């Protein structure tokens, strides 16, 4: 069964790369990048893989307005952010531990002429600038210790500036930690044939 999943995953990757070339001409979203090639260690982050094209179907479940701001934690080349920009977020931002990956993302945004869409370099283990955001996006970009640190910083922000916050998580390998050890609660999920491509959405409400 595991070998079948790997084969199906490779077929999906090939199909998704083809779709990305059609959807985002002139952009570099599709190719996977290892930690070594991106300039960081496996202890700092996971390899880059582009988010799936199903993200807009997930975002349509939310009443997004210009008052909402979303942050992609571990944005890589920025594909998820380009998809987010189809919605009326007041701001779409993202960061990656690799400055080279953030540079690729910003080149992609310029190619697509996307406004209010910017990637910057930061380490999720130490980043604390969550106060301005009420939507967060993760695509299993972080090892568990770093993910715990990031969620801890997010919870500090929510205590400091109480607000409703939604977290969108693709390939939610640390789902149990979120629902057991944090104040976030699952509100819905979009299932796929593999957990690798399953989205789970969570919500935090103050009080």
Where are these regions (language model features)?
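Conserved SAM-binding strand-loop segment of SAM-dependent methyltransferases
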Residues: 114-124
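Conserved SAM/SAH-binding beta-strand->alpha-helix loop
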Residues: 98
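Conserved S-adenosyl-L-methionine
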Residues: 86-91
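Glycine-rich SAM-binding Motif I of class I
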Residues: 78-82
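S-adenosyl-L-methionine
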Residues: 1-65
